[in-house]
Amino acid sequence: VYAVGVSNSLCKDKKLFEKDKKRLYDFSNKINKNKVLLYFSTCALNDPSRNQNPYIKNKLEIENFIKKSFAKYLIIRLPEIVGKSNNSNTLINFFFKRIREKEVFDLWVNARRSVIDIDDVTKILIDLLSNKKHENRTINIANPKKYSIDYIVSIIEDLTVLKAEYNLVNKGETNWEIDISQIVNSIKNCKIKFNKNYLKNVLKKYFI
């Protein structure tokens, strides 16, 4: 399992990205390349509005390196993960912090995000790993529903009983999809229900 890297998707520091790649290169020289390498990437690679983002470019370069360098691999692309984390750079943590501290933030009007519970990611991943047919694939583990940013913020406002203060910014991309066809059976096997209350229940679980 290789689960290290730049944690801030807004990072633009080239030195950090070079360090990230060097770490993987060094790691690849120390392990048996016939073993399956599990790497966590990002579903944001599917979002055309972010294809020039340095963080996204770095993820793509690493994915390509893995595909060329390892005989066996499984690349898991993840959306916005919700769980117990002190990383203030994650989208949900960012919104909760800004709203609770009554700080103004920019709200991207056109942006859409898939949000999933880390526990559900774990369940789906375990189910996938039990099937070796998934070796040498790139798989999205995501909630099929993409929520608008203003909807996510409205749920947080409802849960915290606080009013968010933000500036509307005409950014983001609405017309992009996350292909979850490779995890449909796993979702059924794990009995995960991405229903209309999913987002609110997940946010309540970790933040309220």
Residue ranges of each PLM-predicted region?
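NAD(P)H-binding glycine-rich loop region in Rossmannoid oxidoreductase-like domains
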Residues: 1-22, 29, 43-49
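Conserved Rossmann-fold NAD(P)-dependent oxidoreductase catalytic core, especially the SDR/UDP-sugar
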Residues: 24-56, 74-77
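NAD(P)-dependent short-chain dehydrogenase/reductase
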Residues: 64-113, 118-122
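Residue-level signal for the nucleotide or nucleotide-sugar donor/cofactor binding architecture
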Residues: 90, 113-116, 144-147, 178, ...
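Amphipathic alpha-helical segments that line or abut small-molecule/effector binding pockets
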Residues: 119-130, 200, 204
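Mid/C-terminal beta-alpha module of Rossmann-like enzyme folds, strongest
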Residues: 131-180
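Amphipathic terminal alpha-helices
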Residues: 193-208
